[in-house]
């Protein structure tokens, strides 16, 4: 049975919890922080992710894992991702380790346990499937991951067959 994603009302609760975490940290640190865009488009095994793309900050949540473990994610994942955001704003991404001392200190400001990961039973949760590409060599065909395929296309990687030792060629 597939787990249903969280409802729009639950999404609003998550955004509100995210905002409250940021506001609470702002009061305690005597600094004003803005709420970055919050999306519910994350797939795979991660419940949440903070990322910066082209100088745009964003917090992403997995609606399926939140759907299965809503209360736990509200209490743990939200402050975890907010702490990444605040650590970035306060110290910069390149100056600190992802779960280093600075991040742990921000987690404590948020009254959250600075744990790195949660171990959930993901039965029924839609997991991201990596796309495979067809390649061939002198002796057989191969399914190459999207990451390796992109490396070949950019010219930054090449792969050979383990059996015949000939280069793998994209089969289209």
Residue ranges and their predicted role:
Residues 76-88:
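Active-site recognition of the HExxH zinc-binding catalytic motif
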Residues 2-72, 89-172:
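Metalloprotease/metallohydrolase-associated module, dominated by Zn2+-dependent proteases
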């Amino acid at each position: 049975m597939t787990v249903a994603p969280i409802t729009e009302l639950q999404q609003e609760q998550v955004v509100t919890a995210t905002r409250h975490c940021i506001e609470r940290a702002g009061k305690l640190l005597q600094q004003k922080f803005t709420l970055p865009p919050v999306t519910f488009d994350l797939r795979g095994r991660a419940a949440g992710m903070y990322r910066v793309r082209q100088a745009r900050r964003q917090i992403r949540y997995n609606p399926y894992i939140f759907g299965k473990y809503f209360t736990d994610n509200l209490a743990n994942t939200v402050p975890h991702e907010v702490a990444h955001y605040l650590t970035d704003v306060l110290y910069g991404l390149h100056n600190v380790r992802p779960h280093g001392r600075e991040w742990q200190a921000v987690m404590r400001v948020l009254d959250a346990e600075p744990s790195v990961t949660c171990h959930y039973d993901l039965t029924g949760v839609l997991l991201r499937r990596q796309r495979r590409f067809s390649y061939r060599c002198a002796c057989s065909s191969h399914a190459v991951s999207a990451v390796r395929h992109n490396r070949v296309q950019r010219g930054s990687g090449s792969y050979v067959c383990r059996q015949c030792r000939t280069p793998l060629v994209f089969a289209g």
